[in-house]
C-alpha cells in the first residue's frame, strides 16, 4: 500500500458490547471526494434492484440518474423531485449488488444497500454493507500487491477491529471510503486472496484489556514503529508500543523531498503537522514521520524512511514475516504487543 495514511484514532469498544456486534452492518459513505450533485445507480445482471422514497418501490432495470435539485432529488425521466432519502436494495433480502458512479469521474461496484440523500450542494451516498463484505473490500484495497495469506489475515483482523471500535467517525455515516478511515474499493470475488483472508478470520478482533482495539496500521514503518506520544497523538487506551521491524530496518523504503522555507516553517514532528502539509502540497510532500533534515540552497531537504504514520501494523514488515513462516497471530502479536485475538 503506497497511499499515505491519515490519523486513525485508537478508539475502544467496551467488552460488554462484543456480544451485540455479531452480524453487524457497516455504514460507509462512498464517492464523497467528488462532492457531486448527481449519482448514477446501475443494476447488475442477475441482481434484483429496487428503490423507494417512502412509498411504493420501483424496479431499477437500467441506469438511474439521481440529481440534486434545490433541496430535493430528481430521478431522470420522472416528473417530480423527491424529498428526503432514496433507499435502494434487493427488496426481499435487503443487500444486493449494483454500480454507483459519478458521471465522467468514477464507477464502482458495491454489495449492500444504498442510501442517497440531498445535502447543501451535493448528494450524499451511503452503502450499508455486511461487516465481512466491508472487511474483505478493505483488505483488497489496503494490502500491498502479492501479500502472503497470513499477512492478509492479519490485515483482516486489524480492519475488522477498526470497524467495530471506531464507529461514528462521520456525522452522516460511520466511515468514509478513503484512508481517513479505511480505503475501500469493490468487494473482491470468492476466489480472491482478500476474500479468503476475511473468511478465514471471520469474527476475529484484537482485544486489549477486554476492549476491542481500533487498530492503526501503515504501509511501511522504516524499521521501527512509533508510539502515539512520539507523534503528538493522545493515548486512547492502547499505548502502541514501539517495536522493531526487521524487514524495514534491512530494506527501508527511502524517500527525499524538498520544502520551501515558508512550508518548512510549518513542519513539526507530529502526525497532524505532516498531514496539514500533505493536504497543502500533496501526499508525497512528506511521505512518512521518520526523517532527518538539512538546509540546502534556501530550502529544507528531508531524507526519510517509511510511508505513513508508522503506528501499529507495518504492512510491508508483516508481509515479510508471513513470507518467512509467521502466522497472522504472530504478526499481530509483534505489532500489537499485549493484545489478544478473540471472536467478537
State where each predicted segment sits:
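Conserved, single-site charged/polar hotspot
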Residues: 2-10, 18-344
